[in-house]
Swiss-Prot record:
Pfam family name, one: TENA_THI-4
Source domain of life: Bacteria
Protein name: Pyrroloquinoline-quinone synthase
Catalytic reactions of this protein: 6-(2-amino-2-carboxyethyl)-7,8-dioxo-1,2,3,4,7,8-hexahydroquinoline-2,4-dicarboxylate + 3 O2 = pyrroloquinoline quinone + 2 H2O2 + 2 H2O + H(+)
Keyword set includes Nuclease: no
Keywords noted in UniProt: Oxidoreductase, PQQ biosynthesis
Amino acid sequence: MTEPALMTPQQFEQALRARGAYYHIYHPYHIAMHNGEATREQIQGWVANRFYYQTRIPLKDAAIMANCPDAATRRKWVQRILDHDGHDDSDGGIEAWLRLGEAVGLDREVLLSEQLVLPGVRFAVDAYVSFARRAVWQEAACSSLTELFAPEIHQSRLDSWPQHYPWIEEEGYGYFRGRLGQARRDVEHGLQLALAYCNSVEKQQRMLEILQFKLDILWSMLDAMTMAYTLNRAPYHTVTDQPVWHQGKLL
């Protein structure tokens, strides 16, 4: 087997972008939502479970900043936290997602309670936050490079959902519109970090594996939702139709 060679920055960027072939936009659950084939329950289930991911993004970014000794990087990275938590001029992405939840017919208190979060989704998201806390900050930061592929997925929802799901209130689409510009800005910074840090074969190959880890997380979340909302096989479905799984917040 041929040993991998050191890639130029251009080749390494191309290798990172090539991982977009495994982005969760190609998961059957996402394809169904895009094509107008998802049921109301499937849309609501996705919004409710994805909300858990949204609420953990600022925790992930705070962990990266806590491990980062470089003030210039922290000054840029903190914007990601503000984007989600909000600031004087913006309610933030988490509030925008709550409005999406309301637009698809969910009560915001139900979303905030996390009672609809499936164990498989919780485990996947928690693994991401745990990695960000334990990894060297450059690796944790670059695990966010799935943002390379995010603008396309946000735009696809804006293009297809109003047509396919007229029952979703227009106010719910604010999150996707806001992330179009934010994601492109974040990609530029994250890509700069990756290209500067990955200056050896070992670092380049490890970063590709880290990006795959993040792709695995996103795909696994949709696998859990598929079991629950498409195949009607939520956890413990063979013994009860009640959501008896743990609700988190154990530590």
